[in-house]
Curated annotation (Swiss-Prot):
The keyword Cell cycle does not apply. Residues 1-33, 328-342 are cytoplasmic. The gene is Tmem30c. It is a multi-pass membrane protein. This is Cell cycle control protein 50C. It comes from Mus musculus (Mouse). Specifically expressed in testis. Pfam families: CDC50. Glycans are attached at residues 66, 80, 89, 205. Residues 55-306 are extracellular.
């Protein structure tokens, strides 16, 4: 007589739909009309958004002044690193054809400067930048210590190569009267950078705190003297320094330098007319065949006048609509051939 196997009933799964894997399911049945509707709606939406973004970007007013060749004498001087402490100034007049209404932003723009190199990005000390351990130079090769073996603060390749041109914008009221355009050096950074990623050490005397350290090789003054007039913009919290430390993804990039202070003759923006840029030329670009320029620009609700986002939406929408018409054509041809067969 054959023995029946014995089962431990306590180990059997509960008799529920979930445990027995008998939950009801629903399979989405996509018909040709549903697929075509999705494609047409998606394509129309992306194309509409793209056109809106492009029109908005086109509405920004912008002027770019390249001063690489205009300041050629200074550029030649800066090719020799031993001349880093020698002053060199140049002036660049230009004409603004249209009034720039509202908030106006000044950027510096670099061509051919690769901030996205892996070794360059890693060459920094986050412990220094948050004020936790200003003597930590572990990851700052090859700019860890100076020639006399004292730690560099701030260390690393990014800090060492900071953009250090000084730019002043002036407005020519007439042939004999020139006034300096008031600019703000605050409100240039991201909130997270200013209040999270960069902090000064807890000290009331930066001179004693940073005693025994060296400034980066090509800096004119140490980190604690970047802005003696504004303690909130000094040290690691200096906004020009913070803006530079946020590395760019592409070799051609622009970074915010100043904001227009809307007072007096500039309360409504920058009036059309003759201007001039006075530049203290310090940042070398000719040695790597680069260029640099100043950009004055207004903003819209989507930001600057970049066309990338608008073009992306427009191209995506156009391709989706083309695919929609192709699918529709194939569907009608197959439907007609099926009717002819019957």
């Amino acid at each position: 007589m054959e023995m029946m196997p014995q089962y431990d009933l306590s180990r059997l799964p509960e008799n529920t739909a979930l445990k027995q894997q008998t939950l009801p399911t629903q399979q989405l049945n996509l018909s040709a009309s549903v697929v075509l509707s999705i494609f047409f709606i998606t394509g129309g939406f992306c194309l509409s958004i793209g056109i809106i973004l492009l029109l908005s970007a086109k509405s920004t007013k912008k002027i770019e002044i390249n001063y690489t060749k205009t300041c050629a004498n200074c550029a030649q001087l800066r090719e020799n690193s031993s001349n880093f402490d020698k002053a060199c100034n140049c002036s660049l007049p230009f004409y603004l054809p249209e009034k720039m209404e509202g908030d106006v932003y000044m950027y510096y723009k670099l061509y051919g400067f690769y901030q996205n190199l892996y070794q360059y990005i890693l060459s920094r000390s986050n412990s220094q930048l948050v004020g936790k351990d200003i003597w930590d130079t572990t990851n700052c090769d090859p700019f860890q210590v100076s020639h006399n073996d004292t730690p560099i603060i701030p260390c690393g390749a990014i800090a060492n190569s900071i953009f250090n041109d000084t730019i002043t914008l002036s407005y020519n009221l007439n042939s004999s009267t020139q006034i300096e355009v008031p600019m703000l050096k605050s409100g240039l950074t991201w909130w997270t950078d200013k209040y999270v990623k960069f902090r000064n050490p807890r000290s009331s005397n930066f001179t004693s705190t940073f005693a025994g350290s060296s400034k980066p090789l090509h800096w004119a003054k140490p980190i604690y003297e970047l802005d003696l007039d504004d303690p909130g913009n000094n040290g690691f919290l200096n906004e020009d320094f913070i803006v530079w430390m946020r590395t760019a993804a592409f070799p051609t990039f622009k970074k915010l330098y100043r904001r227009l202070k809307r007072v007096h003759a500039f309360a409504e923006g920058l009036p059309a007319g003759n201007y001039s840029l006075s530049i203290s030329y310090n940042f070398p670009v000719t040695m790597f065949q680069g260029e640099k320029s100043i950009v004055l620009s207004t903003l819209t609700w989507i930001g600057g006048g970049g066309l990338f986002l608008g073009l992306t939406y427009t191209v995506t929408g156009a391709l989706t609509l083309l695919a929609s018409f192709a699918i529709l054509t194939i569907h009608l041809m197959l439907k007609r051939s099926k009717l002819n067969f019957l």
